[in-house]
Amino acid sequence: MRDFQGIDANVKDWLRKAREIILDSFNLSLDVETKSGPTDLVTNVDKEVERFYIQQIQNAYPEAKILGEETSKIHPLTNMEGLVFILDPIDGTMNFVKQKRNFASMIAVYYNNRPLLGYIYDIIRDELYWGGPVYDAVYCNDYQLAIPTDSILSEGLVQLCRPFVMNDSYGFRRVVDASAGLRMYGCAGLEFINVLTGRCICYASTLRPWDLAAGKILAETLDLVVEAIDVKETNMLSSKVVLVATKNAEKDITKLISI
């Protein structure tokens, strides 16, 4: 890939500027709308940050394709050929609205369907997790992360989305029972971070492309398993039930769930 270091520098700059937009919004009233249901929210800040990212990408890389959470229905992406940016301006919008914390901003960069760079920015903690196969490393700001210990299920905390617990989807309650405990954060980016750093042993949820792309790049760079458990093919442009875990935990989990 051409000048990936230039892309890396640009994306980091965009994320820092987006953080300023988001933090400045805390002093203003939010316009909050619902999308697919009462818990699926979008705010004027989500839209503003996505517009900012799109403008920066189009200025720097006019040939690039863009898939953004808030514009995906207007400008759907049909293939991953060429330079592709996948955007989630505010991941965990409910947390952003209700808590003013526990949310992230995420960008993933692909080239000809190959992962290059992933970015998950914990806005409040000012912690940027970034890296990918072009660096063969993942960092939190300037600190390089170690590959997480390949622990078994019983040794770690699991993270699941609410429906998997409430409805026992795929039999995930058995996974909870076999683990050291359950945690739920309501933000895919932060839950990916917990697995990247070894704080939790797995994360499973129904994820859309913008929820998944950046975390998948970072997790696979750290030798973690990222797999769709409801479909055979991993198409980055479709929603799917995703499990990210250590290799040993993944083996334990697949023995317990029903697919």
Report residues per predicted region.
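N-terminal subdomain of lithium-sensitive/metallo-dependent phosphomonoesterases centered on the IMPase/IPPase/PAP
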Residues: 1-90
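ATP-dependent small-molecule kinase catalytic core of the GHMP/sugar-kinase superfamily
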Residues: 123-154
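DPxDG-like acidic metal-binding loop motif
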Residues: 78-135
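Generic detector of well-ordered alpha-helical packing
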Residues: 47, 70, 89-92, 123, ...
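Residue-level signal for inorganic ion chemistry
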Residues: 18, 22-25, 46, 57, ...
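An extended, acidic
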Residues: 148-259
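A short, compositionally biased
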Residues: 28-29, 103, 131-136, 220, ...
